[in-house]
Regions:
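N-terminal, polar/charged subdomain of small-to-medium soluble alpha/beta proteins
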Residues: 1-120
Length: 120
């Protein structure tokens, strides 16, 4: 199966180190979830906050057969921390989706309903 990766950087100067980090994290995701069809990683600088300085947002869109999963992490001062948190969230979401597909999700019994009987 062919895999496509798209890296988008907005309002921020493109960095080879940032791209290498994204590629490394995507390769890690791909090794644990080989059924991924495509991945789009968007790194965006939201602007400057008057107290915290620069703010970064990372959004990851992953397509698997029959499903699209989105992970988005807002407002972090360090772009690499925002990347780490977004990829950690995506890893958890992919793991949960795989469990759901295998049917390993815990099911709860239907709640009991009480019947009121009146004796006359």
């Amino acid at each position: 199966m062919e895999f496509s990766l798209q890296i988008v950087v907005r309002h921020l100067e493109h960095s080879d180190a940032l791209e290498a980090r994204v590629r490394k994290d995507v390769a890690k995701l791909l090794s644990s979830h080989p059924r991924m069809v495509s991945c789009r990683v968007t790194v965006e600088e939201l602007g400057k906050h008057h107290r915290q300085g620069r703010q970064f947002q990372v959004r990851i869109d992953v397509r698997t057969p029959g499903k699209e999963i989105v992970s988005r992490r807002d407002h972090h001062e360090d772009v690499y921390v925002a990347l780490r948190e977004a990829f950690d969230a995506m890893r958890r979401q992919l793991k949960d989706a795989a469990k759901l597909a295998r049917g390993e999700v815990k099911t709860h019994p239907a709640p009991r309903r009480a019947e009121v009987t009146r004796e006359r």
